Amino acid sequence: MRGHDRINNCLPEELILEIFRRLESKPNRDACSLVCKRWLSLERFSRTTLRIGASFSPDDFISLLSRRFLYITSIHVDERISVSLPSLSPSPKRKRGRDSSSPSSSKRKKLTDKTHSGAENVESSSLTDTGLTALANGFPRIENLSLIWCPNVSSVGLCSLAQKCTSLKSLDLQGCYVGDQGLAAVGKFCKQLEELNLRFCEGLTDVGVIDLVVGCSKSLKSIGVAASAKITDLSLEAVGSHCKLLEVLYLDSEYIHDKGLIAVAQGCHRLKNLKLQCVSVTDVAFAAVGELCTSLERLALYSFQHFTDKGMRAIGKGSKKLKDLTLSDCYFVSCKGLEAIAHGCKELERVEINGCHNIGTRGIEAIGKSCPRLKELALLYCQRIGNSALQEIGKGCKSLEILHLVDCSGIGDIAMCSIAKGCRNLKKLHIRRCYEIGNKGIISIGKHCKSLTELSLRFCDKVGNKALIAIGKGCSLQQLNVSGCNQISDAGITAIARGCPQLTHLDISVLQNIGDMPLAELGEGCPMLKDLVLSHCHHITDNGLNHLVQKCKLLETCHMVYCPGITSAGVATVVSSCPHIKKVLIEKWKVTERTTRRAGSVISYLCMDL
């Protein structure tokens, strides 16, 4: 009977709350909260996480949220993310006039004036100590708090937060100009703190860090510091002396030397994850790390000027549990150092070599011979690595699932055939500007790697239609990027459309020989397509788009700049036919006023003024 909701009235509140708990995405929870007023009132009890971007008057916004959501344990404030507000100006067309002196008009005028004055004041769109105090009062049970680039938060607000939110376990202050007093308060009151991020906190010194470390010594497990000139070895010495449970350490600083890292190695024997960009640290410190940090599982080193094969040998000798190794721009590490790691750390599962110009074929061969558990390999800007390196990977690393190759001019089809035949569990293959890789290697991948779901072949000039035909026959791809592969034409993309019905992401930008026919095939064969990049495709027209969107109703993003065959009619077709569309990248002159009114929020314009 109309007006009577018999089923909903019989549902207990516990069951409705359980429904909300099982909904993972925020849009789904929002949709279910609109079932009725009862569901809307109950939905707030299921929320445990809030994410807030830069918006007008965030201090007031925090107060409003605290009154609605009562069980929040995680709050993420990121002021790098802007939140656009709906326009408060009156609509130009009105069916019924209103007196400008009416109460509602007066309220609207005040709100508009307040908005415009706030736009002139930078602080109005930034969280301040007042808002942080409101957050502390409204969410005293919070456990995880991220304040990313909140420049108007100071020690005053942080002190208030620390006193109220004593259950805090994770605190991220990246880019906040807080001082030592606030950090000391966190150390005094937040005795359960486990994770702390102090990246780009320029107002901090050793004094505040030491106070926090001493106060949270029994709980602290993770510390991150970057670009803080006044945080030195003294802070690390305190960490080594007090934080016996420390497992994760991220350091990016030219003011940290061997003394500080040695102190950490001597005191923090549970250290598992070490990520460093410290130009002043030398092999001496890594000798201590290798000898004392026997639980180390992840090591990432960036732009080291005094780290050599000697340090690598120390790690290989002592850190037998190492599973993840990243070396980026470490110019003084050679094949000998990587061989020492391979021989000593046989549990390696992931290796990334980026711009280390002295590492060549022999180092990667050693990984292939000694590390059978390897699952991911990334070789970026490695000009001295040749085919035989990946031949050894194919022979010895049968569990390899992910392979990244960027600007590796010495790797060609011989290497890819070896990978295809030996690493049949390969799931992701990303190749960019490897000009010796062509059809033969990719055909072999399609023939042998049946589990492949992601394939990226960007600017690989020798890859053509035959390669994609083999992939379409052998693999059920979900993501494909062939941007800049100029030998690929309609036949290759058609083969993918017919052979990969699970495809969700496709990038065919900068392909000069692609026309409308593949888009029609994609519409018929790939109904799950969500992301499409067509930019710089000169032969695609509105007709192709029309065929595509008739069946691809899940499309969320479409990039189509520099496509002369696409007009304002094609843009209108995309935004009107795809109910889930979130972003369309196009030249501004191709968007009509009607399309702007209908879907202005999803249109992104190519910047032409650069």
UniProtKB/Swiss-Prot annotation:
InterPro entries per record: F-box-like_dom_sf (IPR036047), F-box_dom (IPR001810), Leu-rich_rpt (IPR001611), Leu-rich_rpt_Cys-con_subtyp (IPR006553), LRR_dom_sf (IPR032675)
All copies of domain F-box, residue ranges: 5-52
Pfam families: F-box-like (PF12937), LRR_6 (PF13516)
Keyword vocabulary terms for this entry: Leucine-rich repeat, Repeat
GO terms for biological process, alphabetical: nucleotide-excision repair; response to UV-C
Region of interest called Disordered, as start-end residue ranges on this chain: 88-125
Transferase recorded as keyword: no
PANTHER family reported in the protein's UniProt record: F-BOX PROTEIN YLR352W, PARTNER OF PAIRED, ISOFORM B-RELATED
Stated name of the protein: F-box/LRR-repeat protein 4
Name of the gene this protein is made from: FBL4
